[in-house]
Regions:
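"A position-specific structural signal for the A-helix of alpha-solenoid helical repeats
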Residues: 55, 92, 127-130, 134, ...
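Short coil turns that delineate tetratricopeptide repeat
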Residues: 47, 81-84, 119, 153
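Structural motif corresponding to the intra-repeat A-B loop/turn of tetratricopeptide repeats
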Residues: 63, 100-101, 135, 180
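Start-of-helix register in tetratricopeptide repeats
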Residues: 51, 84-88, 123, 163, ...
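Catalytic-site signature of metal-activated, phosphate-bearing donor transferases
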Residues: 1-68
C-alpha cells in the first residue's frame, strides 16, 4: 500500500499499542537475523522497494549488526522517497557510525548532515551533544544541546523522540554548562 503524497497521519488520543514479549517469536534470539534474511530475499525480487530496504536496516540494527545496518540505512537514504524516512535513515546511519567507533570527524559530519536535512528535529543535535560530551568537548556540546533545547516538538510522524525535544536536550545543555563553568545556568536547567 502506498499513499501519494504521504500523510496526513493524525494521532488518535487515548489509544496505544500494548506490546508484550510472550510469544515464541519474541523469545527467539535470532528473530531479527531471520527478519533480515527474509527482507534480503524480498529485495532480490523487488530491489527498488524502499519499505523493504528500511526494515532491513531496522532489522540489522535490532540484531546488533551495526555495520550491516549502516550500509542498509545509507542505501535507504539514497533511494529517496518519503522525506521523514530518508531523514531517519540518515540519522540512524550516523548513530551506527558512532556505535562502530568511527573517527570523530565522520561521526560529527554524519550527525550534522542529518540535522541539515531536517533542522526541525532535535534528535541529531542531542545525539551530537551527547557524543561531544563523551569526548569532553564541553563547549561544542553546549552549542548543539542549547539549539536542540530551543526547538519545539517536531510535528513529523515518524519516530519523534519527545524526550530528545524535551528533557534530554535540557540535560545535555545543563551538563555542558556545568563543565564550561556556567553552574548557575546548569542549576536552573536541572
Amino acid at each position: 500500500l502506498e499513499l501519494d503524497p504521504p500523510g496526513p497521519y493524525p494521532r488518535v488520543p487515548g489509544f496505544w499499542i500494548d506490546v508484550t514479549t510472550e510469544g515464541a517469536r519474541s523469545r527467539d534470539p535470532r528473530k531479527f537475523h531471520k527478519d533480515a534474511a527474509l527482507l534480503q530475499a524480498a529485495l532480490q525480487r523487488e530491489p527498488g522497494n524502499a519499505r523493504y530496504q528500511f526494515y532491513l536496516a531496522q532489522s540489522w540494527r535490532d540484531a546488533g549488526e551495526w555495520a550491516q545496518a549502516r550500509a542498509a540505512y545509507r542505501q535507504r537514504a539514497a533511494m529517496g522517497g518519503w522525506e521523514e524516512e530518508v531523514w531517519y535513515s540518515r540519522f540512524e546511519a550516523a548513530r551506527m557510525d558512532e556505535l562502530l567507533g568511527e573517527p570523530a570527524a565522520q561521526v560529527i559530519d554524519a550527525y550534522l548532515a542529518a540535522h541539515d536535512q531536517r533542522p526541525q528535529r532535535a534528535e541529531p543535535l542531542v545525539a551530537l551533544a551527547s557524543y561531544l560530551r563523551g569526548q569532553q568537548r564541553w563547549a561544542s556540546a553546549r552549542v548543539f544541546a542549547e539549539r536542540a533545547a530551543q526547538l519545539p516538538l517536531a510535528t513529523d510522524q515518524l519516530f519523534v523522540d519527545a524526550a530528545a525535544h524535551g528533557w534530554r536536550a535540557r540535560d545535555e545543555w545543563a551538563l555542558a554548562c556545568y563543565y564550561t563553568g556556567d553552574r548557575a545556568l546548569a542549576g536552573r536547567l536541572w
